[in-house]
Structure formats: structure tokens, C-alpha cells
Curated annotation (Swiss-Prot):
Record-listed E.C. numbers: 2.7.1.71
Protein name (Swiss-Prot/TrEMBL): Shikimate kinase
Catalytic activity: shikimate + ATP = 3-phosphoshikimate + ADP + H(+)
Family under the similarity heading: Belongs to the shikimate kinase family.
Broad class of the protein's primary localization: cytoplasm
MF terms (GO), sorted A to Z: ATP binding; magnesium ion binding; shikimate kinase activity
Gene Ontology terms: biological process: amino acid biosynthetic process; aromatic amino acid family biosynthetic process; chorismate biosynthetic process
PROSITE patterns listed in its UniProt record: SHIKIMATE_KINASE
Chain positions recorded as substrate binding sites: D34, R58, G80, R135
Organism: Salinispora tropica (strain ATCC BAA-916 / DSM 44818 / JCM 13857 / NBRC 105044 / CNB-440)
HAMAP family per the UniProt record, alphabetical: Shikimate_kinase
Pathway(s) the chain acts in: Metabolic intermediate biosynthesis; chorismate biosynthesis; chorismate from D-erythrose 4-phosphate and phosphoenolpyruvate: step 5/7
Cofactor requirement: Mg(2+)
Record gene name: aroK
InterPro entries reported in the protein's UniProt record: P-loop_NTPase, Shikimate/glucono_kinase, Shikimate_kinase/TSH1, Shikimate_kinase_CS
Amino acid sequence: MAPVCVLVGAPGSGKTTVGRALAELLGVEFRDTDLDIEATVGKPISEIFIDEGEAHFRTLERAAVATALATTAGVLALGGGAVLAEETRSALVGHTVVHLSVELPDAVRRVGLGAGRPLLAVNPRATLKYLLEQRRPHYAAVATATVVTDGRTPEQLAVEVAALLPS
């Protein structure tokens, strides 16, 4: 079993929103590894960061991604930092991976002031700019396609991503 599509991208790129729209369009399930982690641990990611730290969260994330890649037949959205792990990048080889690319102004508008996003709690705009610069090469390395999300609706993006998927 393998996902029909794996979505990667920075916070605010639309992975969850576009992923849900894409899954609905294709008539398949939608899965988000961030939501999987929250369900497993029983608390929001922001609390995991506060209580156990980022390193612990990344360990949970690697496990969640590995499980999801092996058990999901629909659309899978990964957390924004999942591609930082070499283990995850290697696991994505052979999958259809779409990078939802977002520029800073749209990302800032979409994520707001970082509510519920632990890495954006302090100076969200500067942090988001740094995250975009740091992670963009990793997204590009794993992606089989890139879709620019700026100024477009989730439904428009779902149609574009669907057109990129193998038949």
C-alpha cells in the first residue's frame, strides 16, 4: 500500500487544506501525520514541544511518517519539518511527492501569529522566513512536482495536483 500523493511544504503552504480538498476530489482518504501524532500522544503539537521538546517531537514524527507511508492509500500530508530527517527523505523515494510552495507574504497571512505552531511562537515572520530558506532545498529534493500556492484557492490547487498524479 502506498499513498496516491504525499504533500510536503512549509507551514502555511496549505498541506492540510489542499490535502483534504484533493482527497475529496479523488474520493480517497486524507491523512496528516501531525494529526496522527496529536491523536497518539493525546495533546497538541505545541504542548509536545513545550513538555518534551523538539527532539522528542521529531522522533514521534519520523515514526508517524514511516507508519503512514506504509498504511495510507490516499492523500498524505507531512508536517513542515518532516523532510529535515534523512530517514524520511529516504523513505519518500519512489512515492509521488508534491511540494506545495508558498512565498513568505502568503505563508505569514495563512499562519497568522503562530497560534498552535510552536516554532513560530517568537517573531513568527522572521522565523517563517528562516524556515522557508532552510527547508526549501529539502522540499525540492524529495518532490516529484512543485505547485505554487500563492493567491490560489485550495480547490484550484487540488485540481492542479490531481492532474500531476500518475493514472
